[in-house]
């Protein structure tokens, strides 16, 4: 059963992956996954779904593909959305952090310059350092692992949705 690729979704071909020096082992794992499902390996110029990449390699593989394809704006907007989620989750109220994310979005959209982005990033770094110093002794360790796993899955789902795929089961290997 071949996977249907949504109209307008970002895809990659074997040739594009090869030309971008993809890891041979990771490529083989994705192709094996497709062969097990479809009974054959796709031709060099056949589009490969980023959902197939995600099923085998997770969010790291999808991010690599998007970088190899030159999808810099999509990756920047993904980073902005992840940063916003993190700020909301951590209940960050310092306006410098929120401004940095806003400027990063403007930069991704071509509305802010590199110097403006640098200034906002430095201010956010200072805010983060100040907050870390104030809350250093908080009990973060126990919840960190579970929270990271849940966030990783949420980020993969978000990235695939942004790349043109509908919300999907994000369990790697599922």
Label each residue range with its predicted role.
Residues 1-174:
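Short, glycine-biased loop/turn motifs at secondary-structure junctions and
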